[in-house]
């Protein structure tokens, strides 16, 4: 799977690129990048794709793109929040404990930023940890919703081959 840039205005979503070898290009995420530049994602496969083949390729790409955006796309107070599954569980646990104890479990310190430039942030009040956790939860929810909307907007009929 690769991103391709071209000066071709009309991109064929499915194209037999080598009839002898039965090689096909499946293309999606077609975007105009600027004047006379179009980009798209492309996967080369060794058979004429069915709509189900195309659906699997594209939805797997959307799922991975969504997971990456969840993991790497949030900044809090200007610093990256690395939302690995482990960190998501830890943040939820710390927030739930703080709420359940009416703040008695605070302070809680989290590491933001990167491994090269870590930033430690300490939450000392329920309001602070709530603001952080709401930012995390909102980011995850809105990113998931964007992935679902992207999938829902795809017209799979455009991928029916003759």
Model-found features: residue ranges?
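A preference for well-ordered globular domain cores
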Residues: 2-162
């Amino acid at each position: 799977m690769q991103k391709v840039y071209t000066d071709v205005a009309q991109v064929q979503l499915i194209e037999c690129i080598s009839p002898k070898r039965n090689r096909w290009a499946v293309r999606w995420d077609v975007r105009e990048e600027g004047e006379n530049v179009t980009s798209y994602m492309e996967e080369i496969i060794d058979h004429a794709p069915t709509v189900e083949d195309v659906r699997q390729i594209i939805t797997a790409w959307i799922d991975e793109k969504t997971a990456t955006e969840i993991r790497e796309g949030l900044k809090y107070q200007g610093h990256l929040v690395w939302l690995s599954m482990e960190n998501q569980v830890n943040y939820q646990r710390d927030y739930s404990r703080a709420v359940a104890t009416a703040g008695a479990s605070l302070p809680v310190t989290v590491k933001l930023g990167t491994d090269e430039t870590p930033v430690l942030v300490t939450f000392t009040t329920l309001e602070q940890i709530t603001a952080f956790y709401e930012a995390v939860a909102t980011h995850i929810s809105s990113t998931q919703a964007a992935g679902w909307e992207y999938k829902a907007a795809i017209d799979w009929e455009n991928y029916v081959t003759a």
